[in-house]
């Protein structure tokens, strides 16, 4: 089109010049040559302008194509995007949580720390102690999560890194850091003995006594056994089980990982899981070397009772295997007067009922309990450790906007020590959660 226009312009100029030559007085030969030169110059300028216009359009199209290639592409799982120049999909998510807490009896910490852990006694003060109510606020449960997915010839390579701020001095703390390829997972994540599908949804960070909520470095193999049934086998870090001695506590000398196995059934009406642990406790001091096998069994379920109501529960029993695993287990083993190890028997669990009142309002009630079976000599040596623990959590959750939850919870805990003393404590907590 532009070439035809240029030709028409050129022909018009040429016709005008010829008309001048016919109807004007005869011109000198030099003047005609000047006109020809001017016409040639005009034609060259037109060609240069056209070439410049073509180059500008080509440059613009190239820039648009480059920008398109650099644009962020949607990833292969919800909320993810493709890393430029890669087939790896990544995402960044988490939530911000503010907790406002009032302890009626004494400061129990940023979570409702009423349970024994690793040979340390409960934070609940015994009857007759000083009452010191406290109000506090913190945001330590705030969570950051990074996920990735990369297709490979061997299957999908998935990774997750997740942190919160429960490290010392509000520092970042690693919660999860693992990779999985096909049926194999390696890294730190929830212990194979527990199941997230049967965990209490409390405003408090920990939940009731008797629950299992631990993460362990591990290597895990999972295999589907049918449409809804999965089998898992894992080797996990034993996390230095606690041994009670006549003078205090010591950590087990770790020589081998714990062996765990689980069966998980997940259906439309709920979930059931059965899991077990086999490990070892070892004591070494001078010429004394003792080792002992420890075990634990976990049963968990959540069952729908109609459309909006759900029943939750777990039961745990162990011979030393629940130490640093179940909230409330005091230790793994006791070293007796003959320098022989004896496993500490513990059992516990929780039961809960939740109900959805509407699309934005729900409530829950949970009761947890733990029993530690100490021998008389261990009771005498460790009178402040808890023989029994109980706790209740009653809460209401409200979602006023998408990705926002407001929770209000009352909790109360009781304990009885090996020495026969008792104590209890109560707390109110408000939690504001903003997910992203």
Annotate each PLM feature:
Residues 398-400, 424-436:
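Outer-membrane beta-barrel "beta-signal"
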Residues 156-167, 235-237, 272-280, 362-371, ...:
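Transmembrane beta-strand segments that form the barrel wall of outer-membrane beta-barrel proteins
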Residues 106-110, 166-174, 197-203, 238, ...:
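Outer-membrane beta-barrel translocator domains and adjoining extracellular loop/strand segments
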